[in-house]
Amino acid sequence: MLISTFFIAITHPTKYKLIMIFYFSCTGNTRWAAHKIAEATGDTLIDIAAELRKADEEDATDKKRTFSYTLSADESLAFCFPVHGWRPPLAVRDFIRRLRISKTTDNYCYAVCTAGDTVGEAMDIFEADLAAVDIKTDSCISLLMPESYVGLPFMDVDKAEAERRKKTEADRRLQDFIADIKCHKAGIHDITAGRWPRINSRLIGEAFTKWIIGDRPFRVDAETCIKCGKCAAVCPVGDISFMKGSTPQWKHNGKCLSCFACYHHCPTRAIEYGGR
């Protein structure tokens, strides 16, 4: 499974105690989860993809630019991320490496990952990235969501009934987790790692990162494309250029996550990938 989303709940340096949920969403699976949590907690949603793009627009050459936030003693820290090839996506890992949290105590921290299948050691990898910036999770969960990765011949979206079952079960488990995080419950590690978590994340995941993830196989059927620009608008890493009246073009800049947001959001199914 490759796709899903990212969020982090923290506060900007301000005199007000406003906790935010920073989310990263591609096809919408974890946007749904982030909104569910925000509805239950009253927290504010911030789009991490927009934050990353804004940083690039200001100075794309500054790869050492940090994202700094301040936490008060009574505020929580939370993360939710997509699983790409049994790993956290590259954009999320880049953000975490550049994240700086100013805190005076060990604030309560939880993490959520979403995937269409098992997650392998994705959470372990993510927690190691957090540890490198002095953050430790107290509880974590993985949610099984509708499949969105279609990049290989044997992988496809779920049938309608399977999708319905996944959504129902994910909603039930998320509601239970929300009740736990509201009271800062620690020690929850409800992760569907799968049968071969290390092989999937370390070996196959490395192969995905090196040889499969990328924008080269994407193309547009010019006759079907209505030139609406939706694909460029939904790309979380800004890898698609679009000018009114023209067909979209991929930038081949190494940022593509193979999240298939463009593929799934195209209203006329004009975007193709490989033989699909």
Short names for language-model regions:
Residues I204-G229:
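Charge-patterned, long linear interaction tracts outside catalytic cores
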Residues A55-T66:
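Intrinsically disordered, low-complexity terminal tails and inter-domain linkers enriched
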Residues V220, I226, K230-L257, A261-R276:
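Iron-sulfur cluster-binding cysteine motifs and their immediate structural context
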Residues T11-P13, A60:
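Glycine-centered signal
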Residues F6-F7, Y16:
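Aromatic (phenylalanine/tyrosine) cluster motif
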Residues P13-E51, S68, S72-F81, G85-A207, ...:
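FMN-binding flavodoxin-like domain, especially the glycine-rich phosphate-binding loop
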Residues K54-D56, S148, M243, G274:
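Short secondary-structure boundary/hinge segments and terminal tails
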